[in-house]
Amino acid sequence: MTDILRRIEAYKREEIAAAKARVPLEELKARAADQSAPRGFHAALAARRDKGEFGLIAEIKKASPSKGLIRPDFDPPELAKAYAAGGAACLSVLTDAPSFQGAPEFLTKAREACPLPALRKDFMFDTYQVFEARAWGADCILLIMASLGDNDARRLEEAAFALGMDVLVEVHDAEEMERALRLSSPLVGINNRNLRTFEVDLAVSERLAAMVSADRLLVGESGVFTHEDCRRLEKSGITTFLVGESLMRKDDVEAATRALLTGSASIMAAE
């Protein structure tokens, strides 16, 4: 685990302990049970793939630790509507506050504003967080293999499946991919960003995609800025992408989303 991830785990453990003190697990489970059924995150992406279309997980992200504030006029419901109108298949919403200025209500309000399934984008370490995610309306959780041991990853995955949620398993290298493929989730995200250096290289996805059989649905994460980037990864069998910052920086998010997916304009090229 990198120093960055160790720091994140430390504050997450403190957050989780405080949350458990505020809302006991049984109360949280009741809140999760009161939610409407998950919308089918994997199913939405698989439907796009099966129609021969690109699938986009469009991210609602206010800030990042490496870039600082990304979008000053940050309105999660309006962004969700723009993404849906532009052709996104799913949402990803940051709920981590210390590093990304995220919040639970961003997820809840974004999902309420559109029909798309939503991922809780956060650092997951405890099954309590899985119940949190469902109570907030999430349809999917993220497991970052760089921050989890195999037993912890399996336990979190099982908790999500028991709630009818999907799981996006994120990897960055071959060792993490091998571990991810021992889990049950068909959704595997390849993060092209090195968490040690923050450098981004699409070749990471191209290398790791060769390790994966057709029964998994691969997601290219980080470094996808243009329709041409999508076409490049398509050659390696990746037709689903998680994109945040490049869309968040655009004035017309709907048009930028459409351009990314269809190549209908050059709006994505100017960063």
Curated annotation (Swiss-Prot):
EC class (word): lyase
Any one GO BP annotation for this protein: L-tryptophan biosynthetic process
Alphabetical list of InterPro entries matching this protein: Aldolase_TIM, Indole-3-glycerol_P_synth, Indole-3-glycerol_P_synth_dom, Indole-3-GlycerolPSynthase_CS, RibuloseP-bd_barrel
Catalytic activity from the UniProt record: 1-(2-carboxyphenylamino)-1-deoxy-D-ribulose 5-phosphate + H(+) = (1S,2R)-1-C-(indol-3-yl)glycerol 3-phosphate + CO2 + H2O
EC number(s) on file: 4.1.1.48
Keywords: Amino-acid biosynthesis, Aromatic amino acid biosynthesis, Decarboxylase, Lyase, Tryptophan biosynthesis
UniProt-listed Gene3D superfamilies: Aldolase class I (3.20.20.70)
Associated pathway: Amino-acid biosynthesis; L-tryptophan biosynthesis; L-tryptophan from chorismate: step 4/5
GO molecular function: indole-3-glycerol-phosphate synthase activity; phosphoribosylanthranilate isomerase activity
Family: Belongs to the TrpC family.
Protein name as annotated: Indole-3-glycerol phosphate synthase
